[in-house]
Amino acid sequence: MDKKQIQPLFVTGRRRLLGTAAGAAAVSTLAMPHVARAAEPIRIGLLQAKEGSISIQAQYLQEGTFLALEQLNNQLLGRPAEIVWMDEPSAQGAAQNAQQLIQQNKVVALLGGSLSSYALAEEAVAGRYRVPFMINNAAAQEITGANCNPYTFRLQPPVPVQAAAMLPYLQSIGKRWYFLTSAYAFGENIASSFKKLLAGIGGTIVGDDAAPVGSTDFSSYILKIREAKPDLVIGGLTSADLSNFLKQWKQFGMSDKIPFTEIAVGDTDLWAVGKNNVTGTYTTLWYYKDPNNSPADKAFAAAFEAKYKKPAADKAWMGWYSAKTMFNAINKAGSTDPDAIVKAMQNWHEEDGGITVHFDKWNNQLVHRFLIVDVKKKITDNWDYFNVLRSIPENNAAAVKAFGVQADSACHMTPV
């Protein structure tokens, strides 16, 4: 295994342990097995893309993840802990790496899932091997829906939840919508969810395109949109694809003519567009300038900027929060037993933004507030792009309505 994949932790402490073991061997060889076991770190597997269109988001996800462990002094259960980070080259490759982390690296838990297609493949492996898995980015409905299993948890609200939150804003603009989404699980979820909402308000689909993931030239799509003259464009483009589209959208002079909207965007997607080109209304899970951030979130943002010399993107927070929640569950469980960790995750909760943040036990979906934001008319720096329009849900009753109930879910998993 490539040693660069393992975060070097407790180097000094481990050397001291090895020195102690050597001294003990001089006295009695019977001490050696005990010392070796004591020095063995707890390993956490991280599956995050190292290249491709999602890699910029993934960079922030992994930075937040490593920071979460550092804030625990790189320890879990009073033992040294380390993160083993592997790539997500494809859905199949991600599944193979998840299996390697479990079988060869002996990780006690998994974190990751940069894209929905990767997360769905990894989720199947986690369920098969009974390893707790916290998906920190993917939003496809199936993750905590039809493909759910008791060992997989998810941070991001599923696509239908975020789409429904956007409806009042979109309906006020008009009912003639054009769809431009990426041809994979996330984009397909966006298209199906918004089409259902549009049908419910008696609207019209005036165009519907699915672009291959990794597309760089969107000119043909933009020309079709311009000719169709929709009231707005529903986007479902991933990471670098979204960045490329918005740059070309501006170049074609469309940014001031037809509103653009998308859910579950990353700060980095828009930072890459540049402050003079960016436009739109979006949902995002967290924003570093949100005045309603909790004290813990504000402390995280400060710690991240101090360490990495840049503001914390939403993906940095998502990596940090997912890891922090998993690490808390391991410590709360008092062991690395997978079922004990799962139960600790399911029984955890905290108060934030007027709601009780928790995992619904029937599908392991995190219930947490998210934001509707729009791009500022005048952006004065390279990072602070958003006005926060609304935080959703506002209270626990609204959370139940937004995230749904077990009777309406496609998830039918057997509890551990």
What are the language-model segments listed below?
Residues D2-I6, G13-G19, A38-V416:
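Extracytosolic ligand-binding ectodomains
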Residues V11-T12, H34:
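Intrinsically disordered, low-complexity regions enriched in serine, threonine, proline
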Residues A24-A25, A36:
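Cleavable N-terminal signal peptides
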Residues A26-M32:
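Hydrophobic membrane-targeting signal helices
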Residues M32-A38:
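Sec/Tat signal peptide C-region and signal peptidase I cleavage site
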